[in-house]
């Protein structure tokens, strides 16, 4: 079974599919013993058990019955993680090889349990809408929000908050008139102040018996309950008409904007009220706060930039030089809001619909820590926003939303391994079990994590520390169990359990054969981004280089000081070029990007699986010609030819590039003449492939159709390996553009060939 087939079954992709047998050996392999795990990986044949799981009775283990458990005829089973002996429930007695329960079958390394515990509240969606935008943008946004109601469960609870200079909380329980409560946009309210201003104490969540008792209470008490904070979140099926009318009646914020000034926008206060109100009303239940912002917050709390246009918004350079005067205070405020949302199991999504930065960098942990969505678009009128927003509500075959709420993620291991940490859109629950390592990597110090929201896209990098110090027999196995509890949109609590086993070895060749260079590159990219959030960019690049040199010194074949003797085996051959493109990527090279763009790109990389992440690191390039089938070509300037069409997929952009000759023929409209039907077909082929890529991608990529010499061709050139540049003398095709030797790239970047040459020199010289 290859690495991708294993991923399709269990949603797990290891950098090393065998672990070093001792802690000392693990310290020498450079790339961490980590795994990429997608808990809600979609599978058509996923085993589903409509009952609660059986747990190991060892309180320090509490793993779940799985196919690796040994079962004896006397009704006992042995846990492979702790080796504890457990009794099976009475209804499991009498099982045999021909009559195994679902979770013990070989095909059930991943299984989902539908538990008997009911969900007391449906999912909750709170729409927080910025009114400081032009009418066209606002109306387009409102239209899409109304369309989204068709995708929500009818019993979903919905709430509405709008903001400009002031914050308005709309009372959906008021039927006769549109009633709302106004909060100042320049004030940070406490939970108690919000509760007091909305006039009533929080209503408790009632079970069926309590509801019957409530119906027998005096009318006065019932009216008090009706005025509780729950009136701001009502079932969509009950208030859809009223909410739609309310949205359609929204207008631009009436507060005047002075010349040379930005609108007074209270983004921070609006988010504070939304997160606090949800926390007061539905703590511990699945909920999303969906922020739609059309510009930066210009009022404290959470001010991103002053309201005078003469004050520029912060850049990467300002932040690096500590010249961004609002940055630290704003980031601290939004981090505190993120912590409050995590505590209450609530998710925050941020949708930006403007050319300006809105402060995503300061607000990033609202999404990163809660598993929320982050989306950048130029306006709410664009298809990037419209289609991406509605794709958030994709459903499964049974019509349920493809999103999990209010989740927890637990990692169990056998005694040979310990959990070092996690990198992904999650938060630590601070549960330090016996299998938690002292050596932290990423979010460490815990084996339990909060997943306020998760989906079939959400992938987490989990890191392990080899705890064993003694040599083990060649047949030694380690076991890992991932347990994900979450609230399903059908109204059930579910548990997704994945159990995997990796062998431990001290044989270097076995380790080499187990190396998955694609997963390793993505895992190292996540570690690099995690480091970038804390360390200087130049230091991070030097660290990346050192790790690559050390890996090659460990696993390459070479003779000391003989560069030409350097050889990498097939398991490692592509890894250096992945690192080369990672070094050049927008994740690390932030010069041409705004801080908001950097936050967005990094957020998406920390969300996606191995294949999608690898496309972000090293984009794919496909060539289309008249006399051949479409084929993958090198991401290199030599791939640009006059008679080619190139399709570039960077994950964030889908670009079709027409070579010089193809472009000239297209401008001459040859494709409209019957005798050139084959040329018309050639022009259509990349469009069809691009449409397939656009169909399921989230967020929707920006589509670019360009040609040699076109202004947007820069998106292609910036991604190509510059093997031919303006200052090289190695051109084959002469001084023109797009000749037989490819195009000249106007850059001072080092080419892959030069990078590899330097790498080889450093490796064979023994330098680090």
UniProtKB/Swiss-Prot annotation:
Residue stretches spanning the membrane: none
A single GO cellular-component term on record: endoplasmic reticulum exit site
CDD domains: Sec23_C (cd11287)
Topology of this chain in the membrane: Peripheral membrane protein
Keywords: Cytoplasm, Cytoplasmic vesicle, Endoplasmic reticulum, ER-Golgi transport, Golgi apparatus, Membrane, Metal-binding, Protein transport, Transport, Zinc
Function of the molecule: Component of the coat protein complex II (COPII) which promotes the formation of transport vesicles from the endoplasmic reticulum (ER). The coat has two main functions, the physical deformation of the endoplasmic reticulum membrane into vesicles and the selection of cargo molecules.
Family classification: Belongs to the SEC23/SEC24 family. SEC23 subfamily.
Protein's recorded name: Protein transport protein SEC23
Organism this protein belongs to: Lodderomyces elongisporus (strain ATCC 11503 / CBS 2605 / JCM 1781 / NBRC 1676 / NRRL YB-4239)
